[in-house]
Amino acid sequence: MRSSAKQEELVRAFKALLKEEKFSSQGEIVVALQEQGFDNINQSKVSRMLTKFGAVRTRNAKMEMVYCLPAELGVPTTSSPLKNLVLDIDYNDAVVVIHTSPGAAQLIARLLDSLGKAEGILGTIAGDDTIFTTPASGFSVKELYEAILELFEQEL
């Protein structure tokens, strides 16, 4: 089998496994892929694939922390349904705090990081459902707060 065909098959199998929402560790994903005949797979390859496809750890229906894929692959945009995952945006003298649906903070932070300094974002720190965002030089926290509100079309 051609290597690109084998790679496509690996990607399909990888995505199918993550859709099952039952793998809590990279090692479990490695074993599952090896059982499907992907003998060359190892933890570092799985780690790279998780990053490449934007996989996040979130709670499944059984409240277990598992790896899953976001609804949309690639860098999300503010026109995607991701803006519906933002529950609240607030700020203080130092940071803008964004509260999201459980498991959505990393996706929203990825969107904000992709916008970067041009929108006034120096960087983000994301947990499971909370994001801290700090303004870039030349931007106040209030200006960043207003820019983020505008991105997600929420009321002041």
From Swiss-Prot:
Reported function: Regulates arginine biosynthesis genes.
Organism: Escherichia fergusonii (strain ATCC 35469 / DSM 13698 / CCUG 18766 / IAM 14443 / JCM 21226 / LMG 7866 / NBRC 102419 / NCTC 12128 / CDC 0568-73)
Predominant location category: cytoplasm
Record-linked Pfam families: Arg_repressor (PF01316), Arg_repressor_C (PF02863)
Similarity section: Belongs to the ArgR family.
Protein name: Arginine repressor
Keyword annotations from UniProtKB, A to Z: Amino-acid biosynthesis, Arginine biosynthesis, Cytoplasm, DNA-binding, Repressor, Transcription, Transcription regulation
GO BP: L-arginine biosynthetic process; protein complex oligomerization; regulation of arginine biosynthetic process
Compartments where found: Cytoplasm
Keyword Protein biosynthesis: no
SUPFAM superfamilies registered for this protein in UniProt: C-terminal domain of arginine repressor, Winged helix' DNA-binding domain
Lineage: Bacteria, Pseudomonadati, Pseudomonadota, Gammaproteobacteria, Enterobacterales
Record gene name: argR
GO cellular component, one term: cytoplasm
GO molecular function terms listed in the Swiss-Prot or TrEMBL record: arginine binding; DNA binding; DNA-binding transcription factor activity
Coiled coil region boundaries: none
